[in-house]
Amino acid sequence: MKKILFVASECVPFIKTGGLADVCGALPKEFDKNYWDVRVVIPDYSCIPEQYRNNFEYVTHFYMSSGPYVQDKYVGVLKYEQDGVTYYFIDNQEFFTGFSPYTSDTKFEIEKYTFFDKAVLSMLPLIDFKPDIIHCHDWQTGFLPVYLKNEFAANPFFWGIKTIITIHNLKFQGIWDREWVQGVSGLTDNLFTPDKLEFKKDANMLKGGLVYADYITTVSDNEIQTEYYGEGLNGLLSARHFDMQGIVNGIDYNAYDPQTDGRIYCNYNASDFRKKKFNNKTKLQQDLGLAVDK
């Protein structure tokens, strides 16, 4: 049986701010569990609804330093199972407490997710789970492939693990002062070069993931390889185009079924959608105080 670990900063039904959460919530459920052992790990945000948090199971804990500036931090590991998928949650109240999963403090966010990336790898031997593939998502998981190919490379447990990183939003890359990022990550000097983590003399988490991941997927076919849409990384992405695939997002047909979706005014199906979609449009126009028309 092959093993896959999804690593992300958000995942439905636990926490969602955008489409990333939909993908990480829907895709793991679709694997045939007879052939795939699929698990997911996200931070244990205090804003995850109590209906889930009250059912989390304690797995283990340990203490970890991610760099000279981040020493001896508590890492708790919690677990929850749903729809045949095991979800893990990395617990640290210093980083993951608040009314929202994210803050506007970029410096803190980079420190937080650098810690998260290293904690995810560090927990794997303790829970006795060695994935064949680790599927990373967006800049928040960018340092995981970097750690795997460098700091963790000497440990036989991690040999043979492959990584994929998916870009959901290239505009956000996790960029900050190189010296400070090195201080919170513990990554060595030789990694902060223009062909690796350096970006315009700063450090770039997403770039690190794109350099060190074994494969890259995007939610568009080829736009990000162009200068206009490449957000400064189009050269790197073009250089790796043989290891990259564009996969346009689909939808969860159970969550977005117009026959059963309770979030629309009037449910419909293939035989009556013309009439009933008009009813939905009319109700929306009325609710927003717009002129009602066809």
Task: Place the predicted regions along the sequence by residue.
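Catalytic cores of nucleotide-sugar-dependent glycosyltransferases that transfer UDP/GDP/TDP-activated
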Residues: 1-294
